[in-house]
């Protein structure tokens, strides 16, 4: 009974079993299936988490049982040490016991090789126990290991920057984003319309023919030199003239589409007799019989200031509400330039998107500055909380010593409370 009294107190843990149905529903469902059903790939992650839960529960049980077993082992070793010391203090008792009970001594010596205590064993056991204690303190099971499935850790690590406090560096980045870029005006420029492909091709064809003729007539190069220069000058003059006229339509009418539509609306129908019924007037020609060229005929019908007339008609129609103001027109008053219309459409969308982004950035900057102010107030609240707790500890220490708090301590406590209350009002406001 005395030995049982010396036994250190043991903890009888009440191990609560893991409810597989609630904690591990997927694991329970897989166990209830037949072998033919198998396990799906999408179930592996859930099964891994549930198996890790069961493993951690089993590890906790094993660690608790190992702790209690170690307590019993240490107690048994200490009891053996006490017997050994008692025999050393009473050698006569040890000698008489050896003479009176030789067989039992032999049995004890033989048994000393077993788990029971013996006269020569406790010291080695004590050393082994100390080694075990030392190893138990640095047991690798106690060292936290990274879980195999670190998806939650990676998720919170990715979310943490969005939940952290706003810094001055982030405010500066927002202010930099609000500045207009240097090349913003480049996106709203409309490039000038180049030469029409027919004009460019005609010029290229003429130049190609001239080069081929020059190669074919190397011997007559000196004779044809002045003429070729004159031809080049004529070609350049014709091209410049066509560019100045902005390529009038094939029918030779110098007026724009709006002017033509307006005149067609003002002219009454069926007032002109058919061409086959009207007599053809005689056109006096020159004696040499040379007819006029289409280019010379176009000169007779050329009217100056047609572009300004087209623009003025458009303005009047828009002001009278007969024409939409957002109708796009191309170069020369033509509204059939699809490339220009698409370019202007995309530029308008870009302007709207830029304005929307700028408004959102301004709103975000305003909210960020407001949050910075609140962060400073929260920091002041934490400082005020510490001051209130310090004053509370002083008052409680005075009461424990059965003395009344001094006026200074009370004033400090009231001051800390009022300051904290004022900061909270600012934070709520």
From Swiss-Prot:
Tagged with keyword 4Fe-4S: no
Cellular localization per UniProt: Nucleus
Family: Belongs to the NGG1 family.
Sorted UniProt keywords: Coiled coil, Nucleus, Transcription, Transcription regulation
Record-level GO cellular component terms: nucleus; SAGA complex
Any GO molecular function: transcription coactivator activity
Function: Functions as a component of the PCAF complex. The PCAF complex is capable of efficiently acetylating histones in a nucleosomal context.
Keyword NADP: no
GO biological process annotation, one example: regulation of transcription by RNA polymerase II
The protein, known as: Transcriptional adapter 3
Ranges annotated as spanning the membrane: none
Coiled-coil ranges per UniProt: 41-70, 364-404
Region of interest (Disordered), residue spans: 86-132, 208-257, 274-308
Basic and acidic residues: bias regions: 208-221, 230-249
Gene behind the chain: tada3
UniProt-listed Pfam families: Ada3
UniProt organism field: Danio rerio
């Amino acid at each position: 009974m005395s030995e049982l009294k010396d036994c250190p107190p043991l903890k009888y843990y009440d191990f609560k079993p893991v409810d597989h149905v609630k904690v591990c529903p997927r694991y329970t469902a897989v166990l209830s299936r037949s072998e033919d059903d198998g396990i799906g790939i999408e179930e592996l992650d859930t099964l891994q988490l549930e198996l890790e839960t069961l493993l951690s529960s089993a590890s906790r049980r094993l660690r608790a049982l190992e702790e209690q077993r170690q307590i019993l082992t240490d107690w048994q070793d200490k009891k053996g040490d006490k017997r050994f010391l008692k025999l050393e203090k009473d050698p006569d008792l040890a000698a008489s016991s050896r003479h009176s009970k030789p067989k039992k001594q032999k049995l004890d010596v033989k048994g000393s090789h077993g788990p029971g205590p013996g006269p020569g064993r406790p010291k080695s056991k004590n050393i082994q126990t100390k080694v075990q204690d030392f190893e138990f303190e640095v047991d690798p099971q106690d060292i936290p290991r990274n879980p195999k499935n670190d998806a939650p850790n990676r998720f919170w690590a990715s979310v943490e920057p969005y939940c952290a406090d706003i810094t001055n560096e982030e405010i500066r980045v927002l202010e930099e984003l609000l500045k207009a870029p240097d090349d913003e005006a480049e996106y709203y420029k409309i490039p000038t319309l180049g030469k029409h492909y027919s004009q460019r091709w005609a010029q290229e064809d003429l130049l190609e023919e001239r080069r081929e003729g020059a190669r074919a007539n190397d011997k007559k190069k000196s004779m044809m030199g002045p003429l070729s220069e004159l031809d080049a000058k004529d070609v350049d003059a014709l091209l410049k003239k066509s560019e100045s006229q902005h390529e009038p339509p094939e029918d030779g009418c110098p007026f724009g589409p709006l002017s033509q539509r307006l005149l067609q609306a003002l002219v009454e129908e069926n007032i002109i007799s058919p061409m086959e019924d009207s007599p053809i007037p005689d056109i006096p020609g020159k004696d040499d019989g040379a007819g006029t060229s289409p280019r010379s005929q176009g000169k007779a019908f050329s009217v100056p200031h047609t572009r300004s007339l087209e623009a003025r008609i458009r303005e009047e129609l828009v002001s009278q509400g007969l024409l939409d103001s957002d109708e796009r027109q191309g170069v020369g008053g033509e509204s059939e330039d699809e490339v220009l219309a698409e370019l202007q459409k995309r530029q308008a969308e870009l302007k709207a998107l830029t304005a929307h982004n700028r408004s959102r950035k301004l709103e975000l900057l305003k909210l960020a500055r407001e949050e910075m102010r609140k962060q400073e107030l929260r920091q002041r609240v934490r400082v005020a909380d510490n001051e209130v707790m310090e004053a509370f500890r002083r008052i409680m220490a005075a009461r424990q010593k059965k003395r009344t708090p001094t006026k200074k301590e009370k004033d400090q406590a009231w001051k800390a409370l009022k300051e904290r209350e004022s900061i909270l009002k600012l934070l709520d406001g």
